[in-house]
């Protein structure tokens, strides 16, 4: 039941979900591309001679992961804010808060999985470009090549799952514990234009 209703809700709120999906996809792509750069055998071979390169790649990867956690958290809060009125309506017609929460989690699971998979694909192409940029900086002869890094993918999956899972748990807690009137009031605050 959740999955069918979740897909219908995604179709109905397609404009908002496209923004959300693109944001998550780009976040996953950036995380993967920087991690793939760090796991690249060519870059690792260059890094043996240049400790500063290793430090730079690690710092950039950490910065991208740190910024990604804020972007993912904001994206989830954005979607929750856009949907609070709808969730309040569901509860007013008799749906339990637990069911509403599970519906939101199902919708976000579909979107998050799709965004991660597409982000991994986009990130693979982007990692080839980043690899080329690094080789240009250090004047190393090269050709553009795209290669998939299973290690980078696994670490990206772990980071993405932790950040996305934490954000979804926070959103689920809000849905479960807020009263209907609070959901409606928050929706009014969220959608009303500021003076």
Model regions and ranges:
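Small-residue-rich transmembrane alpha-helices
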Residues: 28-40, 74-78, 110-139, 151-177
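Conserved phosphate/oxyanion-binding catalytic-loop motifs
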Residues: 87
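Membrane transport/envelope proteins' first extracytoplasmic loop
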Residues: 1-69
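Conserved small/polar residues in nucleotide/adenosyl-binding loops
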Residues: 190-195
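Juxtamembrane inter-helical linkers in multi-pass membrane proteins
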Residues: 178-189
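Conserved transmembrane alpha-helices of multi-pass membrane proteins
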Residues: 49-62, 66, 138-166
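Short helix-coil transition sites and intra-membrane helix breaks within transmembrane domains
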Residues: 66-67, 76-81
């Amino acid at each position: 039941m959740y999955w069918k209703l979740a897909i219908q809700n995604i179709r109905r709120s397609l404009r908002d979900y496209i923004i959300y999906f693109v944001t998550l996809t780009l976040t996953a792509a950036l995380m993967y591309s920087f991690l793939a750069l760090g796991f690249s055998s060519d870059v690792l071979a260059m890094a043996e001679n240049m400790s500063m390169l290793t430090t730079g790649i690690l710092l950039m990867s950490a910065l991208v992961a740190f910024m990604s956690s804020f972007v993912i958290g904001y994206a989830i809060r954005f979607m929750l804010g856009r949907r609070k009125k709808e969730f309040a309506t569901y509860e007013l017609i008799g749906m339990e808060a637990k069911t509403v929460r599970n519906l939101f989690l199902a919708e976000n699971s579909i979107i998050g999985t799709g965004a991660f998979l597409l982000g991994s694909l986009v990130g693979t192409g982007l990692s080839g470009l980043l690899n080329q940029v690094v080789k240009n900086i250090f004047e190393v002869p090269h050709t553009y090549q795209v290669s998939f890094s299973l290690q980078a993918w696994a670490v990206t999956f772990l980071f993405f799952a932790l950040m996305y899972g934490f954000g979804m748990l926070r959103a689920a807690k809000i849905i479960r514990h807020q009263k209907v009137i609070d959901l409606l009031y928050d929706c009014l605050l969220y959608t009303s234009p500021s003076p």
